[in-house]
Amino acid sequence: MNLKKSLFSFGIALLMFTPSLRAETPARAAIVKERDTVLSKIVADVESRYSAGTTDDEAVWTAKLSLLSFRRDVATTAGEKLKQQEQIVALQEKRLNAIKERANTGTSDSLAVLRATDALLAAKQMQAELQPEGKKG
């Protein structure tokens, strides 16, 4: 008898909260869309400034990483999350290569290389975690 009461109470609670979850969805979707637009504009602005020589490549990587991470985090499918993470890995690889080149010319140090290596490894770790079970390994 207690089990029936518990299940009934759970069912009622679920019915009470479900409409509020659906009501949040359009608001959340609007926020997600607006944030994607803002982050995209930031990337475009930083790239423009980089082309003009008024900012460095770190600013470009940071802006792109923010956009890609956001898109990964709000993606609704595992495949889309993985696609965004693959782009993050590619971005981190380019960043590491550029920092290594600067270190070779003496304009960067070994700590910067280590930090960029860590960022790449963290991105690859996340990519591995997002892989479907059958493709891990």
Predicted regions and their residues:
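Charged, solvent-exposed structural "stalk/scaffold" segments
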Residues: 28-68, 81-120, 124-126
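Bacterial N-terminal signal peptides
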Residues: 9-18
